[in-house]
Amino acid sequence: MKAPVRVAVTGAAGQIGYSLLFRIAAGEMLGKDQPVILQLLEIPQAMKALEGVVMELEDCAFPLLAGLEATDDPKVAFKDADYALLVGAAPRKAGMERRDLLQVNGKIFTEQGRALAEVAKKDVKVLVVGNPANTNALIAYKNAPGLNPRNFTAMTRLDHNRAKAQLAKKTGTGVDRIRRMTVWGNHSSTMFPDLFHAEVDGRPALELVDMEWYEKVFIPTVAQRGAAIIQARGASSAASAANAAIEHIRDWALGTPEGDWVSMAVPSQGEYGIPEGIVYSFPVTAKDGAYRVVEGLEINEFARKRMEITAQELLDEMEQVKALGLI
């Protein structure tokens, strides 16, 4: 059996945390031969609820769960962490502007970035799930001196999976037959799910669906899926978000399938003309614990326009965060 790895999870008593932790402990994220130590972070007022989650984790008697810690101190939760899933974030309340949300979450992710830099492993892999995820990841890496910014990522895997599911439904195929789906940009309504490179059973997706469906139905459905779930369920996506987080880390750690890629939001290094520094979703492949942006894809005018709109939104968020003194 391998030596255990340490996985820190914030917001651990929340809805996503509850859907996430048991699957990590069962080996679904890092493999059935990889023991894990879970280091769970919550705010003081949620510690009682977290105690209950810890009891349930113990009661599952997972063979791969090598240790369990619950705390309200980021420096304890992130100590020697190999992976950090930053799920906890302040939710948007009625009457709140996005700027207000950035300010409240800015404080959380500033503190967590600093704590990661201070106590986590130097090669810790960080996934930000808490929204606004892309800009929260930016704040975290800008406040984590000594850690590689490339190891800070934000989750667009849920958008990627939603896009695959919608295309599969439309074409009457299984999601496993769909390859090379791409989501560009921000995890927000400006995201751009790109079908120009996608394949269904080896055939170009746009041979099977028409442009009108793509533009008028597919793009808005994927972009607004989160809101549709809130409307139907009275609560935001939890199980599907947890599933996406597991797949994001699994593929990053264990590698992407041959001949395919996934979508991850990562600090831009200027790929495809996207401004450097913003955390932007790209198509990526991963191998041996390192990811690479897929380069050389042809970008047409339709795609370029949408890629620029979502990049501009992220630049605006970065400016707001700078004005608030968070980076």
From Swiss-Prot:
EC?
Answer: 1.1.1.37
Show the GO MF annotations: L-malate dehydrogenase (NAD+) activity
Q: What is the effect of changing residue 190 to I?
A: In strain: F428; produces a 2 to 3 times higher enzyme activity
Residues reported in the UniProt entry to bind substrate = 92, 98, 131, 162
| Gene3D superfamilies referenced in this protein's UniProt entry, alphabetically | Lactate dehydrogenase/glycoside hydrolase, family 4, C-terminal (3.90.110.10), NAD(P)-binding Rossmann-like Domain (3.40.50.720)
Catalyzed chemical reaction(s)? (S)-malate + NAD(+) = oxaloacetate + NADH + H(+)
Please, which domain of life does this record's source organism belong to?
Bacteria
Sorted alphabetically, the keyword list is:
NAD, Oxidoreductase, Tricarboxylic acid cycle
The UniProt function text for this chain reads: Catalyzes the reversible oxidation of malate to oxaloacetate.
What is the protein's name according to its record? Malate dehydrogenase
Name the gene for this chain: mdh
